[in-house]
Amino acid sequence: MFKKKLALIVLSIISIQLSAQYVDFPTQGVDLSKLNLEQFKFGIKLTPAISWLDISHNDAQADGAALKFGLGVSADYEINSILSVVSGVNFNILGGYAFDSVSLNSTNTKNNYQLTYSQIEIPLGLKLKTPEVNKMSYYLQGGVTSGFILGAKEKNKSLTNRAIPSIDMLALSTPSMVGYFAGVGANYKISSKLKLFGEITYKNSLTSVAQSDEYIATNYHNYLQPIEIRPAAMQFSVGLQF
């Protein structure tokens, strides 16, 4: 019963997200009677990450990575013994450092600043796994992601001991983003219904999270040309699958 409810919740969230991203996506309900719930595997995970920015602009430039964090619920639907459809719901914090002429010429703050974005993400992909040997199995996975941006901020560091509040950047950010992921992982079988897993996953945004028109209209950082900001990350996940 718990697995049935969890499957319904995850599938409903995926359907809502796809409906929001793609206007023509059908919105009919999910018929769980057509799905074999024994083929569903769910998991919970913690995801520390190294994240950075890809910036396209005539002034602003990326300037290094930052340590970030995430967590999530994974959902695998096993097609056969080696192939699964993978999805889930993740909360990610992404971002990195950047600099531009305004930050370089500031006399009160350091030369660069940090941009941070928080998002709810829905991945959808395929997992190809090896047979289990001595309780261990390994896999490759990849696919696409879509997500809603929940928050965005810019953080400058003072050259003195004076604290500088973060700047809310949500109004200058897009409401959603689309990207892709690819990674490797391993499972260790603890019991017949419980596995410990670890993953290394590369993620990159295909769409910019910056609303260029808003940057220019508000004269933010004196930008006169459109800016594109695409977050990326290398994630290191550990979790339990049941």
Residue ranges and their predicted role:
Residues 1-27, 238-242:
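Bacterial Sec-dependent N-terminal signal peptides
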Residues 21, 73, 123-128, 183-185:
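Short, well-ordered amphipathic alpha-helices
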Residues 21-72, 239-241:
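Short glycine/proline- and aromatic-enriched beta-strand/turn motifs that initiate or cap beta-hairpins
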Residues 29-30, 54-61, 107-114, 165-172, ...:
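Extracellular loop and loop/strand-boundary signature of outer-membrane beta-barrel proteins
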Residues 32, 36-40, 48-52, 77-158, ...:
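Gram-negative (and chloroplast) outer-membrane scaffold detector with strong preference
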Residues 36, 63-68, 114-119, 170-179, ...:
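Short sequence motifs at beta-strands and strand-loop junctions characteristic
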Residues 60-62, 102-109, 156-164, 213-221:
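Flexible, surface-exposed loop regions and adjacent strand-edge segments
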Residues 177-182, 189-242:
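Predominantly the C-terminal beta-signal and adjacent terminal strand-loop region
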